[in-house]
Design a protein with these regions (language model features):
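Residues that form generic nucleotide/phosphate-binding pockets
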Residues: 12, 30, 111, 115
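Well-ordered alpha/beta subsegment
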Residues: 89-123
Length: 123
C-alpha cells in the first residue's frame, strides 16, 4: 500500500532512462510483495520509502538526470553494501549507494531482505 500521492513521483521515474526504470520496478515489485510492507512517497515526491511494521528499512530515490537510483538500506553493514555499489554519505544522511547496474539487482534484493528482516525488533 502506498501512502501519499505519487503522480509527480511517477513522472520523475518515467524521465529516467529505461534501464533505471527497470531496476526500480524490479526492486519495488520485490519489496511490496513482502509481508507487512507499506510505502510512502516523500513530500518532494523524489523518493519512495519502504516500511515494515511502521519502521523504515529502505528508501529509493530515482535520479533521471544522473541516471542512477539512490538507495539507503537500514541495518546492513556498509562494507557489505559496498559489494553492490560504492557507499556515499550525504550530509546528515549517511550510507547511500547509487545503483545503475542491472547486474547488481539480485545482490541488492538480498541486502534489502536483510534490512526487511531486521525490522522485526523494537529499534
Amino acid at each position: 500500500m502506498t501512502i501519499g500521492g505519487d503522480e509527480e513521483f511517477m513522472r520523475r521515474l518515467h524521465r529516467c532512462p529505461e534501464h533505471i526504470r527497470k531496476i526500480f520496478q524490479s526492486i519495488d515489485a520485490y519489496l511490496v510483495g513482502l509481508d507487512d510492507v507499506t510505502t510512502r512517497i516523500d513530500k518532494k515526491q523524489e523518493g519512495r520509502t519502504y516500511y515494515r511494521g511502521g519502521k523504515w528499512f529502505c528508501r529509493m530515490d530515482p535520479k533521471p538526470v544522473e541516471a542512477w537510483i539512490g538507495v539507503r538500506i537500514h541495518g546492513v553493514d556498509p562494507a557489505v553494501i559496498e559489494t553492490v555499489a560504492k557507499v556515499r554519505d550525504r550530509p546528515n544522511d549517511p550510507h547511500w549507494i547509487f545503483v545503475k547496474d542491472p547486474g547488481k539487482v539480485t545482490d541488492l534484493k538480498r541486502m534489502l531482505r536483510m534490512a526487511y528482516e531486521s525490522r522485526t525488533g523494537s529499534d
